[in-house]
Amino acid sequence: MTAFLLSVTAIVAYFFGSISTVNLSSNLIFHCDIKKEYPLDNLGITRFVKDFGVKGLAKFLGLEAAKALIPLILGGVLLGIVDHADIGQAFAMFCMALGIVFPIMYRFKGSTTILAVGLGTFFIGSGVGFATLVVFLAVYFATRYVSLAKLAATLMMCLVTLMMIDTPFVKYLVLLTALVVFIENRHGIVRLIKGKEKKFRYRKDISYMFDK
């Protein structure tokens, strides 16, 4: 029974993770190819908010959050049948991260785990979630490096989980999820070491982008 419930959780979580929020929102909400029109950088995000406003950004993030919450909740409900809801949620987070980073339908060319794993940490434990969020925000606002903030937050997720969570399988799954996040950011790590990583700053006035 447990193996069957884990299998269902894995399939659903991986499937939802592998769905591209960019492509989905392009077709359902914005009716344009936002991946092509608005690249994931300073200028692209600035132009996106300028064109679609805060409501457009909220719709995009809401869709991304819903896509993450469904497998997390389902994993907890299914494994809750055998009194292991915590393992089900952690397993869903891990499988969802795999789907995001290695989506088979996009030839294993994935996207970012930042929101999905961020929400997943609160399912592991509120203390884990808040500690992870605080570290992410602190490192980001101190350095403006999103990749560095993600890596620091991931390390904090692991540390607090090891300190606060008693279930061994949950700890293992969190560590495996962290491994996926580090693999996702392997190129960013290299750029950080070489000092070539770009900082992210949102600015309402985008005229500076065209300065010589």
Regions inferred by a protein language model and the residue ranges of each:
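Alpha-helical transmembrane segments in multi-pass membrane proteins
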Residues: 5, 9, 13, 18, ...
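Interfacial segments of multi-pass membrane proteins
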Residues: 45, 49-52, 75-78, 95, ...
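Transmembrane alpha-helix interface/packing and boundary motifs in multi-pass membrane proteins
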Residues: 12-26, 59, 97-107, 140-145
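Nucleotide and nucleotide-moiety/phosphate-recognizing core
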Residues: 56-59, 66-105, 127, 136-137
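Cytosolic, membrane-interface loops and tails of multi-pass inner-membrane proteins
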Residues: 24-57, 190-212
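Helix-coil boundary and interhelical linker segments in multi-pass alpha-helical membrane proteins
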Residues: 1-10, 72-91, 122-128, 161-173
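Loop-to-transmembrane alpha-helix initiation sites
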Residues: 129-131, 146-154, 165-177
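Short, non-helical or kinked segments that cap or interrupt transmembrane helices
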Residues: 33-42, 104-118, 145-156
